[in-house]
Amino acid sequence: MRPYVLGLPRYANVAPLHHFLRLEGFRVLHAVPAELNRLLLSGEVGLSLVSSYFYLKHQDSLGLLPDFSVAVLGRVYSVNLFHKGALPHLARVALTTESATSVALLKLLLKEAGAGPRYERREGGLELLSAYDGVLLIGDRAIKAYAALLPEVPETPHALPTRFGEVEVADLSTLWFQRTHLPFVFAVWAYRRENPPPKALVQALREARREGLGRLREVAEAEARRLGVHPLLLQHYLWNFRYHLEEPDRLGLKAFAEALGLPFAPMFYPE
């Protein structure tokens, strides 16, 4: 019998969920969110951390773990539009190829800001600003790009700047909070309804999350070493996340669905 496959992106913001994960009889497959979305639909992955946009688009065929999320109330630091000039005046924007959720959120927010730029999918980092008015980066790439602009890391996250000369950093989660006063849910654990995860796997994920959050400084230091950035920046970053899909997070996910013109009728994993 093939082992049940768990899909995980290699991003710092999900490290508290899997850094201490102990699995027996299961296999882990690492990929970027866009690839994990495809693998879940094809059946190559049984349970995966997937983008919220993907989940909402396919919720009629997917089940949802009821107490897991990757969400933020306010600033996220790792879903950033690096741009030159005011948002309503952006003409060309380069988009990450790694995530559907961040792209959908950016288009929604820029439309509401009165912008109508031409969007192009591009691989790369801040060097793209030589040809584009804005560059959307997510995950570790966004963290490293922000760290490269930062002269030093302040003791408090409230002092982290958002302007570096002519380059501004628009944090999409902050813009969402200003719009809704709700958290933004970036990812959820989803599975195909005909292939729910074994209870032992779900319990292992809960235990790993509990240990990861209890030893968050240790997780942050490990991720900082991996990315080559200041550990204090990673601590500021990881302390912001909400990993339990609580009622405010569900309301935020529902608000995102409504903004996209999609339903929100989740089928939760049976306990």
UniProtKB/Swiss-Prot annotation:
GO biological process, one term: menaquinone biosynthetic process
Reaction(s) this enzyme catalyzes, per UniProt: chorismate = 3-[(1-carboxyvinyl)-oxy]benzoate + H2O
UniProt xrefs under Pfam families: VitK2_biosynth (PF02621)
Matches recorded under PANTHER family: CHORISMATE DEHYDRATASE
Keyword tags: Lyase, Menaquinone biosynthesis
Domain of life assignment: Bacteria
GO molecular function, one term: hydro-lyase activity
Record bears the keyword Lyase: yes
Gene that produces this protein: mqnA
Keyword Lyase tagged: yes
EC code(s) of this entry: 4.2.1.151
InterPro entries: Menaquinone_biosynth, MqnA
Pathway the protein contributes to: Quinol/quinone metabolism; menaquinone biosynthesis
UniProt family annotation: Belongs to the MqnA/MqnD family. MqnA subfamily.
UniProt name for this protein: Chorismate dehydratase
Function: Catalyzes the dehydration of chorismate into 3-[(1-carboxyvinyl)oxy]benzoate, a step in the biosynthesis of menaquinone (MK, vitamin K2).
